[in-house]
């Protein structure tokens, strides 16, 4: 827990941004350079992972060079008191950065371009190379800070999001089964809940991608094992959500009639799944599963019961996912 205390007060990325700003301004002042442009570069260079910082840094540096170059050129042509110098510098910087696929550096490049115009005066060459140097200082300093200090660890966030996802998807399955038993085959409420669930699942995918990138720079066998375990857990959740979506998004005018035994089976299974979070375990419902399997076997998949057999099959697959997850 010692490495997590700061999360309750201030985020690691915020700390690293502050440190990158401090060291960048310090180096610039030691070299008698204006630090503001380097600081702008350093602030936006702090990314969720070291890999992202390096990858985007490769594009931000040439973008900054382009912005500085246009600032010098248009100031030379129109002077630093002309609105055209600012407008054309910003416009051409955006245009060229877009053409060269340097969009990640466009914002800093434009800010650098328009901010340096008032201070250029007639020292065109000096200002161009000084801005180039300060941008390089900002990129390198921020990259090193992001790589060395408080390397990003997303395990805690992953655990939280996975737990939240599981809580919501078990509850949503329970609610959907109740709707089906009541003959409510189209539901805006469960559709919205499913959309929220998919957003959480996408966030999990993003966090796993960040952590995977980070482990390529900070290799650790135990951390790889932990990430693999979380990845498998997320994969199973995705399968669950996929099958859950198939019992939520049903064709229009769907109508399914369950007999008494099937209704009891659905109630038992949905209650068991809904109780996983509270109980911390999965209570098997073998008799109920046998009932649903028997129902499917008695149906012809090409008769009027085709949708019913498909729906029961999806429920059986969801049960199988959980049965495998909680196998002893």
UniProtKB/Swiss-Prot annotation:
Keyword Transmembrane: yes
Main location, first listed in the record: membrane
Gene Ontology cellular component annotations, sorted alphabetically: plasma membrane
Compartments, as annotated in UniProt: Cell membrane
Alphabetical UniProt keywords: Cell membrane, Membrane, Transmembrane, Transmembrane helix
Transmembrane segment boundaries: 26-46, 61-81, 109-129, 132-152
Membrane topology field: Multi-pass membrane protein
Pfam families: ArAE_1
Entry similarity comment: Belongs to the UPF0421 family.
Protein name (database record): UPF0421 protein SE_1574
Organism: Staphylococcus epidermidis (strain ATCC 12228 / FDA PCI 1200)
